[in-house]
Amino acid sequence: MEKPLFRNQKGLMTLLASQTISSLGDWLHILAVLTLAAFQLHASPLDMSLLMMSFALPVIVLGPVSGLLADRFDRKTIMFLSEIGRALTVISCVYVSELWQLYVLLSVQSCFSSLFLPAKNGKLKELAPEAHIQQAVSVSSIIDNSSKIFGPALGGTLIAAFSIHSVFYINAGAFFLSAVILFFLPRDAFLQKANTPQEKTAALTSIKEGLQFLKRMPLLLTGLLTACVVLFVLQIGDSQAIILIRSFSGAPPELAGWCMAVSGAGMLLTAAITGRRRITSYLLYFSAGTLLLGLATGGAPFLSGMGIAGITLFIFAFFIMGAAFGLVHIPFQILVQTTVPVDYSGRVFGAIQSATTLASILGMAGGGVLAEWIGVSLAFLVCGCLLIMIGLITLIGKKIAESRRYLVTKSNKGAQG
């Protein structure tokens, strides 16, 4: 009989507990920073875009380096220092009086944040039993997506009940608590072997090795490209939803918030389902997720003239978008965890973090440009058609790969006979 995931897994439970608090802290901080910029520092739309860029750009640049550090040094120590750094940066936001100060602090915090994810993912692979790695990744995804739903809601409640500055103090406390929990994690088991003089290599060479590992695995590369395209379109949807909502008569002002919340709920549902089903074909998940996202994105503009029913279906479309993204993102994370050796995982996850963050930025920026150029409704439709085409290509690729495997197997059997 198969043992439950968390039986005798104190280290894994400690890591996930720290991740839960840290992820909530991330979403509390995002809401508090946006509120501070918009209502106290009177940021313009361009200022808000620069604010998001100052948070995202360091992740893109430092992703591969952070991954290398996660493979070279103790991941527990890296995560601990990352949380302490984020806590101190968050407290500093209380004393901000100019927007440029907020840009600097967000960039510094982003540098600390970029250290956390590759180290956490590498530690997850190290601590989770091989037989339960799929469940562990699903639980980790459930934590992240639950935080996306409950973090902003909690942050809004705290801001309404107290003040923005109070939320910064609470947020810093969350990061400090996460650091305290991380103190009880075991040190990395693979470090003693990985850091022997014979195996030490130059930093740039190590980063290249991580990127080359991705190139050598066609399925991993396909998953990464699909995840980036899907994330790109999802960010267009999130960033331009408020513009599309203007075409809905009688739409409540909080509709954009509902759309973002149900998108997180869709990803949460997918994470829960994926953790219970053994994945036999990753390409099937990639193609299904891309097709569903294409249908939901392309169909959203046609709902604007349907009154209350259209608004309800529009919210449901964002639920489908979130679930569809989960069908690509979560199996891809499982694929990486199950195929990448533990001493390469930091570098590979660092490269993935850079690529997906770049896709998010391009989605946020490109969505505005595309909507200005051809109109927001047509932008949704074009993106939907593009995704459907990519989903069909992936599905055809799956069929071709299966046919080749069948022919090879049949040929081998004939040769043996």
From Swiss-Prot:
User: What PANTHER family does this protein map onto?
Assistant: MACROLIDE-EFFLUX PROTEIN, MAJOR FACILITATOR SUPERFAMILY (MFS) PROFILE DOMAIN-CONTAINING PROTEIN
Q: Which Pfam families match?
A: MFS_1
Record's protein name: Uncharacterized MFS-type transporter YfiS
| A GO term for molecular function | transmembrane transporter activity
Give the keywords, sorted: Cell membrane, Membrane, Transmembrane, Transmembrane helix, Transport
Instruction: State the encoding gene.
Output: yfiS
Cellular component, GO annotation = plasma membrane
Q: List the disulfide bonds.
A: none
Q: Which top-rank group of organisms is this from?
A: Bacteria
Record PROSITE patterns: MFS
- InterPro entries assigned to the protein according to its UniProt record, in alphabetical order: MFS, MFS_dom, MFS_trans_sf
Q: Where in the cell is it found?
A: Cell membrane
Name the residues that span the membrane. Answer: 21-41, 50-70, 88-108, 166-186, 217-237, 255-275, 283-303, 308-328, 351-371, 373-393
**Per UniProt, what is the membrane topology?**
Multi-pass membrane protein
Instruction: Give the record's family classification.
Output: Belongs to the major facilitator superfamily. TCR/Tet family.
| Naturally occurring in which organism (per UniProt) | Bacillus subtilis (strain 168)
